[in-house]
Amino acid sequence: MLRFKELYKQKIIESLKKEFSFKNKHEIPKIKKIVINMGVGEAIADSKVINNALNDLTLISGQKPVVTLARKSIATFKLRENMKIGCKVTLRKDRMYDFLERLVIVALPRVKEFRGFSYKSFDGKGNFTFGLKEQIVFPEINYDKIDTIRGMDITIVTSAKTDQESKFLLSGFNLPFYN
């Protein structure tokens, strides 16, 4: 199932070497980790909602997420310090490549009116962040068993030094970009 890992080792490394003429094999950019974050604003009023988000994120990532807590109190949002407000999971190694493969091949084609990602989503240091508006694009989520549609933020952290290197790397994994 780790076709993307083999794709990276066999084809993407060679194309990166040709494009950017790296002298050392450790200079070649690679994906370090993928962080999936799900903010659950409704958890302020109902603490049971966070459990549903945890279950969804566990099914999507194949790994148990950690609950994120509020750092400080904000009265206008009725938010107190250390209140549960979301969950996140960090994927590395084989699970990371497995998730990326499912994202590109299965989930992104199921997103409504999806044209591709903007190049503006890079942060200047080679990392790429985007959001999905609904968790039901993943086949692991059963539409009948969810309580509400939730979005998520996905950050792909790379070892690339520039956005151009990172764009070339992620394009090798068939991530669709427009511009």
From Swiss-Prot:
Give a single Pfam family match.
Ribosomal_L5
A GO CC annotation given for this chain: ribosome
Describe, as the record does, how this protein assembles with itself and its partners. Answer: Part of the 50S ribosomal subunit; part of the 5S rRNA/L5/L18/L25 subcomplex. Contacts the 5S rRNA and the P site tRNA. Forms a bridge to the 30S subunit in the 70S ribosome.
Q: Extract the coiled-coil ranges from the record.
A: none
Name recorded for this polypeptide = Large ribosomal subunit protein uL5
Listed A to Z, the keywords are: Ribonucleoprotein, Ribosomal protein, RNA-binding, rRNA-binding, tRNA-binding
Which cysteines pair up through disulfides? They are none
Q: Which GO terms describe its biological process?
A: translation
